[in-house]
């Protein structure tokens, strides 16, 4: 959620930190601040609101030149979005500065202890206690990394901490527990950040920090230890995208750019995973085939858009493998005492690899003996590291808060998992699996075709900008697509939108239908299971008879829907189970255009964060 940047090196620390914070704006925030070490002391600036407010403060009251600094964009949890609650937080002497992501669950008793010892804590935040505790420990040991280890031993909750001390002018110290923090390694300079995007303009070499570790950056190197002080093994890796991938490149918004990048993202996610004979080759799936053959249940855990990918995966997994599949909201999973064992495969889906609810669900599953396969877009993140295996999507950085290309690549990865399980287990649908693999190989071109026909969708969206409600209907895999379309409209347009299984209309939702109410209907292919198609055509007739304005998404050549569609959006003919890959795209464009017409910020919708790293 929050964005954190730290820097030690020869450049202007303030310039590096501010540029890094701007690259992390997509994570969502409501205040920002910086601290630099200069002239034997600390200099800070912080302001509520967007970074432009902090820029203004810095132009009016410049900070001294410095080579060491930290910065933060805050998403309010404890205390409102005010100047006083913005980070960095200082001790009473103004010698320690701390920035923090996460929640310190035992901050209240710690705050009371500090108050009893005479500390004054003017903010409402949980973070402030850390600055005061660090000051106490540093006064005793004169070692900022050791002080951080001692303080972390007293904290409960999930947190990333980054701190500097005026007495250690070339040192930045960080710590992580259940919250992301990554080290950037440059030429004689080092970076700390909650996301590699913060330093990608300077280096693509990174170090992955493990759970309960403290890192110390100095001009001459990096040292990583556990909270207990023992040396820690770390993994270095090279980021496979550059700074231009996280820039708009002429598009009006990151979301529009990322929608347009979907054909390439889909193709990249398939690259190298299908050999010349049409056989799947998933070397990343380190779970032995013999173990996969013993799997008797699959459980998908995810949140938000990734949950909708999981709902679609259920249809594919059960059809191609004949293994029962459950799909769970990660935030609810561990609280209902799920039945798991060594024959259970848990698939954890997360774009960032740091989604806290999904991470906690994963850990619960492993405690019960289940195998965990992660589907993730972010190398070096926590969820892949703590899973038995990982299938990376290759969407590249997704900056807009509302997920688009990550969703399509998650779908591709889910299909690959389902097909691979079917291939390993030798199910009776083996011949069909070969056909589907060939269809998947051509899906990038189908997505490209959809994108080339979106002008009528944009025009329609603009004409509906004054509406307050839009409903979405679908059957089979079209139902999760309807849910995803509704979610996108909620996130971006701030309007009431609901997705329903079309067969549930008569069980309540039909009461919402009124004159000129826009209803988007995702129509399954008339080929194959034609009963699904026939029933949804009846649903369209039913709502249109009650005055609804029908917006119908149907494949090319489907003439049965034409008499009942007020607006018809054509998509390429695709096998039923793969249809979400093309049917979702018009809904993304629709939501983005409608939100823009309403004057909303599509890249950073209100109240939302890109990576939800707290429960």
From Swiss-Prot:
Its EC number is 2.6.1.16. It is found in: Cytoplasm. It catalyses: D-fructose 6-phosphate + L-glutamine = D-glucosamine 6-phosphate + L-glutamate. Keywords: Aminotransferase, Cytoplasm, Glutamine amidotransferase, Repeat, Transferase. It comes from the Bacteria. The keyword Zinc does not apply. Pfam families: GATase_6, SIS. One of its GO terms (biological process) is protein N-linked glycosylation. GO terms for molecular function: carbohydrate derivative binding; glutamine-fructose-6-phosphate transaminase (isomerizing) activity. GO terms for cellular component: cytosol. Residues 287-427, 460-605 form the SIS domain. Residues 2-220 form the Glutamine amidotransferase type-2 domain. The active site is at residues 2, 610. PROSITE patterns: GATASE_TYPE_2, SIS. Catalyzes the first step in hexosamine metabolism, converting fructose-6P into glucosamine-6P using glutamine as a nitrogen source. Homodimer. NCBIfam families: glmS (TIGR01135), PRK00331.1 (NF001484). This is Glutamine--fructose-6-phosphate aminotransferase [isomerizing]. It comes from Streptomyces coelicolor (strain ATCC BAA-471 / A3(2) / M145).
